[in-house]
Swiss-Prot record:
Covalent S-S links between cysteines: 35-98
Name of the protein this chain belongs to: Berberine bridge enzyme-like 2
Organism: Arabidopsis thaliana (Mouse-ear cress)
Signal peptide start-end: 1-20
Stated family: Belongs to the oxygen-dependent FAD-linked oxidoreductase family.
């Protein structure tokens, strides 16, 4: 009889467990709101524009406001149960504490430029912590420093610096709508990389909310965690609130230019020589190379464009490149002298940068989201002319593929690869693969994603190997995603070493120390050490 009762009990327990379901959305919302209210000591009616369930009128506008890739803005795209539109540090603390208590995944979004939508998409129940309201910027010209909120855009950062000082800038990206939190924590680079290095090279302090909901500065978090969030991707370790950055000097006059050639106009010669000049010339000169298949005179060809910033006057750069890079064919009419802040606008595709006001940089949403896919590579040895001819042929075959070559060298090659988690400093240049399309639907998406993979395979002989390095801020889920189970570390190690090289080991140790339960997790977050307990 006792055995029979035990069997009935076990069967009943099994059925109860099997039929257990996730609490309904309203229950999740009420539980979260109650916790959030308790943590912030705020009356519930004051949080109507902060804690947004799917039924809230502001839910969809806030969620969509910073979705920069149309691939992830469809009816089929997974949506969070709640969006937390934080307006204070206490809101961020409460978001971490309360989401953790409900055992729900938390995604943190600053600017929404993650190429794979990792900051606002998941395939398990999740909340989105939107940081766009935490964008305060305080610039102190006397100390040549600034505090930058994680939700600020790079355009806002540049504008606020210019507002206070005309002789300083900051080495970061050329797209003004990119969020500072994600950009800097992934390393951050722009057109002053050869002169000054990465954005993280100028971070002197930071504020982060850790897994326990505590606000920590550099001293509070310790040097290991500070090292990790400066290039290792902050979302694996906590929620970045702000970075303190050191400003860099910029001259009163800079020069920009653009030179374009196609294959008939000896673009191959120009591209080949670019590899020998761009990474080795004056550190104050950054020459980005853009490659794109186009049609000219009813013939398919490849257009090669050199787009440049020189921290000096046009006569100096003209004299320099006439000697070093005659294949470019730079002419005086290609060059425009302007101020540094005007060059920021010029690089943001404003050809009339000398006529428009810098306030345009405060526009957080000027660009329309298109469908896109990105990949990246690093090059250690110059590609031969035969190799370039092969790649040009494949670009024409694939169509719609764009390549962006960003030269390194300069100060980059003088910095140890372990100074920050970013390990790629000694490379000649970085390549961004860009695939954009306008056609909605799964058929078009499948086709273009396959084309992106195909071209990535064509590039393999010419780039780094074992591992094939790639850039964390050019997120690519094709190279691997985290999976639960006993092999989770080994799976993460594959893409982790592609992003971070040998620095991956130190990142894992830091992660295990500061977030042993793996609360801050996503598709490509840093894993904990094998054998350590982790959330699933």
């Amino acid at each position: 009889m006792k055995i029979f009762c035990l069997i009935l009990f076990l069967i009943s327990s099994f059925i109860s467990t099997s039929l257990a379901v996730e609490p309904p959305p309203e229950t999740i919302y009420q539980n979260f709101l109650q916790c959030f209210t308790n943590q912030t000591k705020a009356p519930p009616n004051s949080l109507a524009d902060v804690v947004l369930p799917k039924t809230a009128a502001a839910f969809t506008p806030v969620l969509r406001a910073y979705i920069r890739n149309a691939r992830f803005n469809t009816t089929a795209t997974p949506k969070p149960a709640i969006v937390i539109a934080a307006r204070s540090e206490s809101h961020v603390q409460a978001a971490v504490i309360c989401t953790k208590s409900l055992n729900i995944q938390l995604k943190t979004r600053s600017g929404g430029h993650d190429y794979e939508g990792v900051s606002y998409i998941s395939h398990v129940p999740f909340f989105v912590l939107d940081m766009s309201n935490l964008r305060n910027i305080t610039v102190d010209p006397a100390t040549e420093s600034a505090w930058v909120g994680a939700g600020a855009t790079l355009g806002e950062v540049y504008y606020r610096i210019w507002e206070k000082t005309k002789s300083h800038g900051f080495p970061a990206g050329v797209c003004p709508t990119v969020g500072a939190g994600g950009h800097i924590s992934g390393g951050g680079y722009g057109n002053m990389i050869r002169k000054y290095g990465l954005s993280v090279d100028y971070v002197t302090d930071a504020k982060i909310v850790d897994v326990n909901g505590q606000v920590l500065d550099r001293k509070g978090m310790g040097e290991d965690m500070f090292w990790a969030i400066n290039g290792g991707g902050g979302a694996s370790f906590g929620v970045i609130l702000a970075f303190k950055i050191k400003l860099v000097p910029v001259p009163p006059t800079v020069t920009v230019f653009r030179v374009e050639k196609n294959l008939v106009e000896n673009a191959t010669e120009m591209v080949h020589k670019w590899q020998f000049v761009a990474p080795k010339t004056d550190p104050g000169l950054f020459m980005r190379l853009l490659l794109q298949p186009v049609t000219r005179n009813k013939m398919q060809t490849v257009r090669a464009s050199v787009v440049a910033l020189f921290l000096g006057d046009q006569n100096t750069v003209m004299s320099m490149l006439t000697k070093e890079f005659p294949e470019l064919g730079l002419k005086k009419e290609n060059c425009t002298e302007m101020t540094w802040i005007q060059s920021v606008m010029w690089w943001a595709n404003n050809d009339n940068a000398t006529q428009i006001k810098p306030e345009i940089l405060l526009d957080r949403n000027p660009d329309m989201a298109t469908f896109g896919k990105r990949k990246s590579d690093f090059v250690e040895k110059e590609i031969t002319k035969d190799g370039l001819d092969f790649l040009f042929k494949k670009m024409i075959e694939v169509g719609k593929i764009g390549l962006v070559f960003n030269p390194y060298g300069g100060i980059m090659s003088t910095v140890a690869t372990t100074k920050t988690p970013f390990p790629h400093r000694k490379k000649l240049y970085k390549i961004q693969h860009s695939m954009n399309w306008k056609d909605p639907g799964t058929e078009a998406e499948t086709s273009f994603l396959q084309k992106a993979k195909s071209f990535y395979s064509y590039m393999a002989p010419f780039v780094t190997k074992n591992p094939r390095h790639t850039y964390i801020n050019y997120r690519d889920l094709d190279i691997g995603v985290n999976t639960p189970g006993p092999n989770s570390y080994r799976v993460a190690e594959v893409f982790g070493r592609m992003y971070f090289g040998e620095n991956f080991d130190r990142l894992v140790k830091v992660k295990t120390a500061v977030d042993p339960q793996n609360f801050f997790r996503d598709e490509q977050s840093i894993p904990t050490l094998p054998g350590k307990p982790a959330r699933r």
